Amino acid sequence: MLALDALVDQDLLICPRCGSPVRREDGEWRCAGAHCVYAQDPFPVVAGVPALVDFEHSVLDADRLRAVQGASEVSRSRSAGLLRRLLHPANTTAPRNVARMLELLRTETRGRRPRVLVVGGGTVGDGLEALYADPTVDLIAFDVYASPVTQFVGDGHSVPLADASVDGVIVQAVLEHVLEPTVVASQIERVLRPGGIVYADTPFLQQVHEGAYDFTRFTDSGHRFLFRRFERIDSGSVAGAGTALRWSVDHFVRALTRSVPLGRVASLVFFWLSWTDRLLDQRHSVDAASSVFFLGRKTEEPINGSDIIDYYQGGM
Ligand SMILES: C[S@@+](CC[C@H](N)C(=O)[O-])C[C@H]1O[C@@H](n2cnc3c(N)ncnc32)[C@H](O)[C@@H]1O
Ligand SMILES: [Zn+2]
């Protein structure tokens, strides 16, 4: 991963309020714009990193963020290794698409290291281990909380990075948690250089997770249209109808018995449903997928309403 100092030295950081450069002086982070509120009041520093957030237009609250020193408001425990492997067959979609993204970027950056941004990257996403271990990629990551795998705290609704500053963007399991996905998608487009590549994967038929911080779902077509100013390289389901059904059993049992542990037990009993995803017809499965993905290249020519009707790749 790039060091925070490298982002400063390369003038990549901008004010999320007004877009002026961000300056660090005597440990304080301020906007260089003469009339900006963040020129007077510095950005908070939490867990040693700046929170480059326009708090007036964010679900984040500056005082609360300072009080918890940038810690996540949501508990981030994952089930233990063996249990996780049983319930979640390895995600092969993300590594395949990210490898393709890097291969395409490398032919274009001609020797320059590709710069890839991870939006909502507080944890290393499923199947992204190889990307994080790749010493030839300049990785930037941020999230709404401070984490050892991010360089700063930020909000995807106003990404504090300069226009056209990255070659690739990864946004995995994040767009359901933002209030305005179209705004976040247009920020992704803004920070990508012309011809830059996005990989997004997002839930479709998944129950609420992360409690109060869960807002939206996407069909495969809706997800593709969110990235309307991108040319499609590939898209489809990440986890299919079997996984969606296992989640439904879990949450049905929770609701019926008023017990989360009993829901988890039911999920374990039906673990095999997730493993059926690979056997299912892809067209029917995408209509009932647990999550969908889109890999695409930024373009000047957006698709329109009739293009998205032609795009439909389900089974009806
Ligand atoms: C389900 S987690 C996925 C995390 C990681 N991408 C992964 O796949 O392991 C959703 C993430 O979105 C982040 N998030 C929520 N709202 C956000 C926002 N407005 N801007 C950036 N990240 C956000 C959350 O903090 C959380 O880390
Ligand atoms: Zn500013």
PLM region spans:
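Conserved N-terminal segment of class I S-adenosyl-L-methionine
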Residues: 1-164, 168-171, 289-292, 299-316
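Glycine/Thr-rich phosphate-binding loops of Rossmann-like dinucleotide-binding domains
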Residues: 126-127, 179, 208
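S-adenosyl-L-methionine-dependent methyltransferase catalytic module, highlighting the catalytic core
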Residues: 182-187, 197-316
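Ligand/cofactor pocket segment of small-molecule handling proteins
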Residues: 172, 179, 188
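Active-site micro-motifs of SAM-dependent methyltransferase domains
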Residues: 38, 158, 176, 206, ...
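Helix-to-beta-strand junctions that scaffold the AdoMet/dcAdoMet cofactor pocket
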Residues: 178-179, 192-194
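GHKL-family ATP-binding catalytic core of two-component histidine kinases
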Residues: 160-162, 179, 219
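A short beta-strand submotif of the Rossmann-like class I SAM-dependent methyltransferase core
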Residues: 171-174, 200
